[in-house]
Amino acid sequence: MTDIDTHPQDDSGDQAALARKQRLGRIQFRSWRRGFREADMVLGPFSDQVAPTLTDAELDQLELLIDEEDQWLYGWIIERDPTPPEFETPVMAKVRAFMREHVAAEVGKGIG
Protein backbone atom coordinates (compact mmCIF):
# COMPACT_ATOMS: atom_id res chain seq x y z
CA MET A 1 0.00 0.00 0.00
CA THR A 2 1.23 3.50 -0.80
CA ASP A 3 1.90 5.93 1.97
CA ILE A 4 -0.24 9.03 1.75
CA ASP A 5 1.41 12.25 2.81
CA THR A 6 -0.91 13.72 5.40
CA HIS A 7 1.44 16.67 5.90
CA PRO A 8 1.33 18.68 2.70
CA GLN A 9 4.37 20.83 2.15
CA ASP A 10 3.98 24.52 2.71
CA ASP A 11 4.99 25.94 -0.63
CA SER A 12 3.89 29.50 0.12
CA GLY A 13 7.55 30.56 0.21
CA ASP A 14 8.10 29.05 -3.22
CA GLN A 15 4.97 30.75 -4.54
CA ALA A 16 6.06 34.10 -3.10
CA ALA A 17 9.51 33.72 -4.67
CA LEU A 18 7.96 32.84 -8.02
CA ALA A 19 5.55 35.79 -7.83
CA ARG A 20 8.45 38.14 -7.04
CA LYS A 21 10.52 36.73 -9.90
CA GLN A 22 7.61 37.25 -12.30
CA ARG A 23 7.06 40.77 -10.99
CA LEU A 24 10.74 41.63 -11.49
CA GLY A 25 10.55 40.19 -15.00
CA ARG A 26 7.63 42.47 -15.86
CA ILE A 27 9.44 45.48 -14.38
CA GLN A 28 12.60 44.66 -16.34
CA PHE A 29 10.67 44.23 -19.59
CA ARG A 30 8.87 47.55 -19.15
CA SER A 31 12.07 49.31 -18.10
CA TRP A 32 14.06 48.20 -21.13
CA ARG A 33 11.35 48.70 -23.75
CA ARG A 34 10.01 52.15 -23.10
CA GLY A 35 10.45 53.57 -26.59
CA PHE A 36 12.51 56.48 -25.27
CA ARG A 37 16.20 55.61 -25.50
CA GLU A 38 17.41 57.85 -22.68
CA ALA A 39 14.89 56.36 -20.26
CA ASP A 40 15.80 52.84 -21.45
CA MET A 41 19.48 53.55 -20.71
CA VAL A 42 18.69 54.47 -17.11
CA LEU A 43 15.74 52.29 -16.18
CA GLY A 44 16.86 49.10 -17.96
CA PRO A 45 20.16 48.67 -16.12
CA PHE A 46 18.54 49.93 -12.89
CA SER A 47 15.86 47.24 -13.12
CA ASP A 48 18.50 44.57 -13.78
CA GLN A 49 20.98 45.58 -11.09
CA VAL A 50 19.01 47.35 -8.36
CA ALA A 51 15.37 46.26 -8.58
CA PRO A 52 16.10 42.72 -7.28
CA THR A 53 17.40 44.29 -4.05
CA LEU A 54 14.33 46.48 -3.48
CA THR A 55 11.64 45.72 -0.93
CA ASP A 56 8.10 45.04 -2.08
CA ALA A 57 7.11 48.57 -1.04
CA GLU A 58 9.98 49.98 -3.10
CA LEU A 59 8.93 47.85 -6.07
CA ASP A 60 5.47 49.42 -5.71
CA GLN A 61 7.13 52.85 -6.00
CA LEU A 62 9.15 51.74 -9.02
CA GLU A 63 6.05 50.42 -10.77
CA LEU A 64 4.29 53.73 -10.22
CA LEU A 65 7.27 55.52 -11.75
CA ILE A 66 7.44 53.34 -14.84
CA ASP A 67 3.70 53.82 -15.38
CA GLU A 68 4.41 57.48 -16.14
CA GLU A 69 5.08 59.01 -19.56
CA ASP A 70 8.73 58.78 -20.63
CA GLN A 71 9.31 62.47 -21.23
CA TRP A 72 7.96 63.41 -17.81
CA LEU A 73 9.75 60.59 -16.03
CA TYR A 74 13.10 61.25 -17.66
CA GLY A 75 12.78 64.97 -16.89
CA TRP A 76 12.23 64.11 -13.23
CA ILE A 77 15.14 61.66 -13.16
CA ILE A 78 17.61 64.18 -14.57
CA GLU A 79 15.98 66.91 -12.46
CA ARG A 80 15.26 69.06 -15.50
CA ASP A 81 11.61 69.27 -14.46
CA PRO A 82 10.11 69.55 -10.97
CA THR A 83 9.15 66.13 -9.65
CA PRO A 84 5.61 65.89 -8.27
CA PRO A 85 5.72 65.13 -4.52
CA GLU A 86 4.11 61.70 -4.95
CA PHE A 87 7.07 60.63 -7.12
CA GLU A 88 9.79 62.16 -4.94
CA THR A 89 10.41 58.83 -3.21
CA PRO A 90 13.39 56.85 -1.94
CA VAL A 91 13.23 54.85 -5.18
CA MET A 92 13.49 58.04 -7.26
CA ALA A 93 16.57 58.94 -5.21
CA LYS A 94 18.02 55.49 -5.96
CA VAL A 95 17.29 55.85 -9.68
CA ARG A 96 19.01 59.25 -9.73
CA ALA A 97 22.03 57.95 -7.81
CA PHE A 98 22.28 54.96 -10.14
CA MET A 99 22.12 57.25 -13.16
CA ARG A 100 24.92 59.47 -11.83
CA GLU A 101 27.15 56.59 -10.70
CA HIS A 102 26.68 54.18 -13.59
CA VAL A 103 24.89 55.53 -16.62
CA ALA A 104 26.43 59.00 -16.76
CA ALA A 105 29.89 57.48 -16.32
CA GLU A 106 29.34 55.15 -19.29
CA VAL A 107 27.96 57.93 -21.47
CA GLY A 108 30.94 60.06 -20.48
CA LYS A 109 33.21 57.32 -21.83
CA GLY A 110 31.38 57.46 -25.15
CA ILE A 111 29.22 54.38 -24.69
CA GLY A 112 25.58 54.77 -25.57
Enumerate the language-model features and the residues they cover.
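Positively charged, polar, low-complexity stretches
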Residues: 2-59, 63-112
